[in-house]
Curated annotation (Swiss-Prot):
Tissue: Pancreas.
Keyword RNA-binding: no
Biased composition (Basic and acidic residues): 30-40
Protein name: Ribonuclease pancreatic
Binding site for substrate: K32, R35, K66, P67, V68, N69, T70, K91, R110
Keywords tagged on the record: Disulfide bond, Endonuclease, Glycoprotein, Hydrolase, Lyase, Nuclease, Secreted, Signal
Oligomeric and partner information: Monomer. Interacts with and forms tight 1:1 complexes with RNH1. Dimerization of two such complexes may occur. Interaction with RNH1 inhibits this protein.
Organism of this sequence: Niviventer cremoriventer (Dark-tailed tree rat)
Cellular component, GO, one term: extracellular region
InterPro entries: RNaseA, RNaseA-like_dom_sf, RNaseA_AS, RNaseA_domain
Region forming the signal peptide: 1-25
Residues with attached carbohydrate: N62, N87
């Protein structure tokens, strides 16, 4: 009888762990935004290899080359504060986008025309521009980089 109970408990444990474990490893939209768009450590400093390094580090060249990406060189708190600034319509028509009230230091990375996976090669361009981000949650946090203006 004791062995039967142990087997049932073990089976339940395996079932629960199998159900919980995948949710523990799933990256949240907010964490993905930080990984793909935040570089608070500095800027490209006009280095032509900045985008190549950052796109690889941000896991955006795994399986294919992401065609366009923007990195923001401002404190995370400043970017999160945009979620309470001017509400604008997103490119996809949703109403959860917000425009920064001031221009931010950003680096734009664009895949060069002749570049093919696995040798993703990016053009690096620095700008001071307003950004538009999508925000979700309570408290509202950035989950998608929508545009620069």
């Amino acid at each position: 009888m004791g062995l039967e109970k142990s087997f049932i408990l073990f089976s339940l444990l395996v079932l629960v762990l199998g159900w919980v474990q995948p949710s523990l490893s799933k990256e949240s939209s907010a964490d993905k935004f930080k990984r793909q768009h935040m570089d608070t450590e500095g800027s490209s400093n006009s280095s032509p290899t900045y985008c190549n390094q950052m796109m690889t580090r941000g896991d955006m060249t795994n399986g294919s080359c992401k065609p366009v990406n923007t990195f923001v060189h401002e404190p995370l708190a400043d970017v999160q504060a945009i979620c309470s600034q001017e509400n604008v319509t997103c490119k996809n028509g949703k109403k959860n986008c917000y425009k920064s009230t001031s221009a931010l230091h950003i680096t734009d990375c664009r895949l060069k025309g002749n570049s093919k996976y696995p040798n993703c090669d990016y053009k690096t361009s620095d700008y001071q521009k307003h950004i538009i981000i999508a925000c979700d949650g309570n408290p509202s946090v950035p989950v998608h980089f929508d545009a620069t203006v």
